[in-house]
Amino acid sequence: MAKATTIKIKLLSTADTGFFYVTTKNSRTMTDKMTKTKYDPIAKKHVEFKETKIK
């Protein structure tokens, strides 16, 4: 069986609220760590989210 190209990742808020999004990424085309600016409802503003592993 072939290895899956898409993997699940966790995008953790840099505002230190503990809020996170779970999304997928293609591990072949996106080899570096993903960062996105998204809304953090606990901080009530848009902040940067950085990729971490799902445990």
Swiss-Prot record:
Q: Does the keyword Hydrolase apply?
A: no
> What are the protein's GO molecular function terms?
structural constituent of ribosome
Keyword Ribosomal protein on entry: yes
Q: Which Pfam families match?
A: Ribosomal_L33
Alphabetical GO CC annotations of the entry are: cytosolic large ribosomal subunit
Q: Which UniProt keywords apply?
A: Ribonucleoprotein, Ribosomal protein
Chain segments annotated as coiled-coil in the UniProt record: none
What GO biological process terms are annotated to this protein in UniProt?
Answer: translation
**From what superkingdom does this record's organism come?**
Bacteria
Alphabetized InterPro entries for the sequence:
Ribosomal_bL33, Ribosomal_bL33_CS, Ribosomal_bL33_sf, Ribosomal_zn-bd
Member of which family?
Belongs to the bacterial ribosomal protein bL33 family.
- List, alphabetically, the PANTHER family matched: 54S RIBOSOMAL PROTEIN L39, MITOCHONDRIAL, LARGE RIBOSOMAL SUBUNIT PROTEIN BL33M
> What protein name is recorded for this chain?
Large ribosomal subunit protein bL33
Source species of the chain: Rhizobium etli (strain ATCC 51251 / DSM 11541 / JCM 21823 / NBRC 15573 / CFN 42)
